């Protein structure tokens, strides 16, 4: 990183841009907590995120710094800070770029579950949907050719996943001891990971093929010797993935699939579905997107209770055989008002979860958001049984600067 920054001495001056956001959030749980030590009712918190960017006058050199922090009144684990992004990027005159530092990379096409999105670790204290990610240290070389784009990654500095604390909601029956992770076999915190991705457009097809070898971002768990907590266990895995999207007028056909080895038996998982958009409904400028997806996961999962070092199972998942349906409504107004709602049903036991999200800009610098998640008819053997009392409603007000 320092060597890369040394090259800036010969670059033109450029300009700095500074922005960011501060938000106040209130989350309400209408049902009493299911487990001891968990709080009831209200969970107020606040976040601050800065955004500092510099680009040289010739556009070849770029610096991005995006720190993030949250202060939570109920869950100590949710009070945390992270460098979401902090990198230097060089853009050549020809067809390649080089990025050095911490960054966020997104792969995927579907709505319900991002199977192929493997580069960044999930910031699990932020929300249950796994959309929030921690910054990942990396060296990324991107080649932009006529035959497509090739991204090559070297990923030092593994990030462990964050989880709610003993007093937090949306957790398992036993809290997770994030201070004592276990790295099995060749996995270790300092191990270097590697990844590559090829992507391109072929007519109406958008295709991505990826490979990853390194420490899994998705831990399995074992019970701590005290019996009072779970310990996350991180394995070394090799994963290949494919994501596709086909555009046909108002139809978007989407799919993601992975094959993973290193966590029990090698297994396949996939998500496939569509989004169909109805334009200008009710003779208004509103666009309604209708979504449907099927989720399959063939892993042999479960708690790992055997002695460390024996053959491991894969991390457990709630998506072995599920159907997701949803709707996305864009009002296309000057306030960027939008809504998204979805329902997931477990085909095997009929457990059901749903969410509703809505947001609207207030003036030039403010945004209001509402989010609700609900759990219905949850089977006691379903992974969601630990959060069946954790229906919640969140209101968030953000000021941009």
Predicted regions and their residues:
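Surface-exposed beta-loop-beta
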Residues: 169-267, 271
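Detector for outer-membrane/organellar transmembrane beta-barrel domains
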Residues: 58-61, 250-345
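Short loop/turn motifs that connect adjacent beta-strands in outer-membrane beta-barrel proteins
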Residues: 11-18, 54-63, 94-99, 147-149, ...
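Outer-membrane beta-barrel "beta-signal"
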Residues: 141, 274, 387-401
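Transmembrane beta-strands of outer-membrane beta-barrel pores
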Residues: 24-30, 54-58, 67-73, 104-106, ...
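Membrane-embedded beta-strand positions of outer-membrane beta-barrel proteins
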Residues: 20-22, 65-67, 100, 141, ...
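Residues that define the transmembrane beta-barrel architecture of outer-membrane proteins
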Residues: 40-48, 79-84, 133-137, 144, ...
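Outer membrane beta-barrel
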Residues: 53-170, 203, 375-377
């Amino acid at each position: 990183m320092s060597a890369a920054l040394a090259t800036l001495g010969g670059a033109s001056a450029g300009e700095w841009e500074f922005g960011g956001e501060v938000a106040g959030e209130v989350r309400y749980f209408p049902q009493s907590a299911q487990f001891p030590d968990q709080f009831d009712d209200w969970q107020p918190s606040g976040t601050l995120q800065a955004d500092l960017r510099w680009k040289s006058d010739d556009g070849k050199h770029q610096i991005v710094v995006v720190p993030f922090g949250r202060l939570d009144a109920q869950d100590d684990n949710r009070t945390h800070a992270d460098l979401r992004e902090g990198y230097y990027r060089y853009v050549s005159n020809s067809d390649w770029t080089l990025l050095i530092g911490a960054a966020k990379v997104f792969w995927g096409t579907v709505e319900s579950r991002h199977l192929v999105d493997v580069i960044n670790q999930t910031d699990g204290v932020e929300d249950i949907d796994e959309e929030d990610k921690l910054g990942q240290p990396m060296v990324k070389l991107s080649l932009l050719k006529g035959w497509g784009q090739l991204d090559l990654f070297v990923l030092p500095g593994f990030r462990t996943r964050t989880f709610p604390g003993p007093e937090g909601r949306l957790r398992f029956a036993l809290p997770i001891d994030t201070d004592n992770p276990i790295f099995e076999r060749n996995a270790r915190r300092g191990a270097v990971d590697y990844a590559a991705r090829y992507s391109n457009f072929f007519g109406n097809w958008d295709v991505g093929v990826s490979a990853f070898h390194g420490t899994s971002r998705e831990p399995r768990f074992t019970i701590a010797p005290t019996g009072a907590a779970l310990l996350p266990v991180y394995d070394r895995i090799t994963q290949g993935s494919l994501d596709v999207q086909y555009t046909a007028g108002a139809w978007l056909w989407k799919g993601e699939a992975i094959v993973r080895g290193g966590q029990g038996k090698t297994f396949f998982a996939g998500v496939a579905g569509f989004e169909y958009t109805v334009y200008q409904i009710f003779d208004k400028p509103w666009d309604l997107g209708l979504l449907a997806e099927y989720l399959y996961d063939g892993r042999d999962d479960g708690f790992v209770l055997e002695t460390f070092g024996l053959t491991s199972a894969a991390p457990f998942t709630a998506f072995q055989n599920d159907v997701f349906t949803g709707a996305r409504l864009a009002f296309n107004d000057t306030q960027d008002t939008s809504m998204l709602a979805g329902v997931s049903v477990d085909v095997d036991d009929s457990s059901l979860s749903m969410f509703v999200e809505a947001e609207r800009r207030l003036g030039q610098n403010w945004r209001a958001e509402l989010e609700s998640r609900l759990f219905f008819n949850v089977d006691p053997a379903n992974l969601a049984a630990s959060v069946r009392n954790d229906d919640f409603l969140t209101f968030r007000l953000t000021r941009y600067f």
